[in-house]
């Protein structure tokens, strides 16, 4: 069987890069965040430009965290400045770094999601110049997987050369650069991009490409921490693993081959994670049997319909009830239109990440039934805290 070569390509701070390019600014040297400052400062930044991230700001910071971090940076700059005075400010990072008398500044760009989708479509057309659609799997608006196995002979290029050619074409076409990971399966390509590309020096165009195979993955990343850096390992998984003495992918791999009498063995992983332990074990060893063809052919057993609203301020029970009513109406109409019924209702409320699930005795599409259930959830979760 022919070995596969996959690449995972991620557009660098995509939303922020689009906003920079449209202002005729360099995405790599412009301090910019994408956020709706018309809301409160608790609003989440959808993107932070690479140069601004270098000041210790995360890619998913809330706007008030950006304000605080920039204020701390400027307090230190003022202390170090001649005469302890800042004479101006700039969002152009090279200028800030060259002139100690300037305060760090940044641009706040309001998000334009429909516009970003148009840009993503334009970039997808660049991928199609090199790879057929059946060998491309869009993972998100700014990230794709590609199987380039059958194209290397066609273009007479190595995997790295073809990957770099595609990225440079994106840069030439849009002004946006990208990072990429390469590997013999989807998982290793993704991890090479997520972790490996961060530690690879950028070339003159800002391009970073990292590559992993099973053996280099084990050599380089079996001791890597934290576990949450790895694809599909969230905080819940990491906390559960650490509670049982597993802190790295190497620990998980060793656990999977433990003897039956040992505390750390495969049975422990299945006890902790059920059938999902199989995926975790495979990934610990650098294995991933799923292909792009498998991903494209996947059809979920269950369907879900979602209605959501972002509240601009805290709501009391009566206001929340009105919102629930509107959402119940919308969901009921959607169910009727699709000729469906449901036996489960999920309501997610607020910053507390409280999720309530009610299983229904009889399937329904009635907005009245769903409203009653939502009121029950709201009464349980919110009524005792009306303010």
Q: Each PLM stretch: what is its role?
A:
Residues 1-285, 289-292:
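Gly/Gly-Pro- and Ser/Thr-rich, intrinsically disordered tail segments characteristic of DNA damage-repair
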């Amino acid at each position: 069987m022919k070995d596969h070569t996959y690449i995972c390509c991620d557009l660098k701070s995509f939303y922020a890069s689009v906003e920079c390019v449209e202002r005729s600014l360099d995405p790599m040297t412009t301090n910019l965040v994408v956020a709706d400052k018309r809301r409160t400062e608790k609003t989440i930044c959808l993107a932070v430009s690479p140069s601004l991230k270098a000041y210790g700001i995360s890619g998913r910071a809330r706007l008030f965290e950006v304000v605080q971090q920039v204020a701390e940076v400027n307090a230190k700059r003022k202390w170090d400045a001649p005469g302890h005075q800042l004479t101006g400010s700039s969002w152009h990072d090279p200028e800030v770094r060259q002139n100690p008398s300037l305060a760090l500044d940044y641009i706040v760009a309001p998000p334009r999601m429909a516009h970003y989708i148009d840009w993503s479509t334009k970039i997808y057309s660049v991928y199609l110049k090199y790879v057929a659609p059946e060998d491309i799997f869009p993972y998100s608006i700014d990230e794709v997987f590609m199987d380039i196995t059958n194209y290397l002979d066609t273009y007479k290029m190595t995997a790295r050369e073809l990957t770099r050619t595609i990225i440079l074409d994106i840069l030439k076409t849009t002004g946006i650069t990208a990072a990429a990971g390469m590997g013999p399966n989807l998982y290793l390509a993704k991890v090479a991009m997520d972790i490996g590309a961060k530690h690879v020096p950028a070339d003159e165009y800002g391009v970073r490409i990292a590559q992993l195979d099973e053996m280099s993955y084990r050599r380089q990343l079996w001791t890597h921490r934290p576990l949450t850096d790895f694809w599909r390992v969230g905080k819940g998984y990491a906390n559960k693993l650490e509670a049982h003495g597993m802190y790295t992918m190497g620990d998980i791999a060793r656990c999977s081959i433990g003897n039956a009498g040992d505390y750390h063995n495969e049975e422990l992983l299945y006890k902790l994670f059920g059938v999902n332990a199989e995926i975790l074990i495979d990934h610990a060893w650098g294995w991933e049997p799923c292909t792009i063809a498998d991903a494209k052919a996947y059809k979920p057993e269950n369907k879900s319909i979602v209605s959501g609203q972002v509240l601009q301020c805290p709501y009391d029970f009566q206001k929340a009830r009105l919102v629930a009513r509107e959402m119940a109406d919308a969901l009921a109409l959607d169910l009727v239109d699709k000729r469906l019924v449901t036996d489960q209702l999920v309501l997610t409320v607020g910053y507390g990440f409280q999720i309530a699930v009610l299983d229904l005795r009889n399937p329904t599409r009635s907005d009245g039934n769903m409203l009653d259930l939502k009121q029950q959830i709201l009464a349980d979760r919110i009524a005792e805290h009306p303010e």
